[in-house]
Amino acid sequence: MFAEYINYHNEYTKRFGDHVIVLYQNGHFFEILASEDEGPNMEQITGLLNIVLTKRPSKNPNAIVPKMAGVQKDASKRHIDLLIENNYIVVIVEEITPSPNTTRAVTNVYSK
């Protein structure tokens, strides 16, 4: 999942510049992910949105443990609006097929 998130982040950052945030659906949440050297500035984003920054645990000791934050999908409009007001381009990646073989795709891109 992290690799797919970073692929979307890199693709849209190349297209639109550094002020891109990918909101990636995982169940009933939109997540934002990053590692120490890839992805958005999580401290800046979580501060702006007033949401908690955490890490996703892994049973694999060699795995990348990404920084993550999330917002409930049903309450995401105000977060999207706040990002847009602060000159971010917001890329929405939603689940388009159900579990267990979930596939995701970009469904919207929002900007000023």
Language-model features, listed with the residues they occupy:
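Basic, polar low-complexity surface loops/patches
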Residues: 1-112
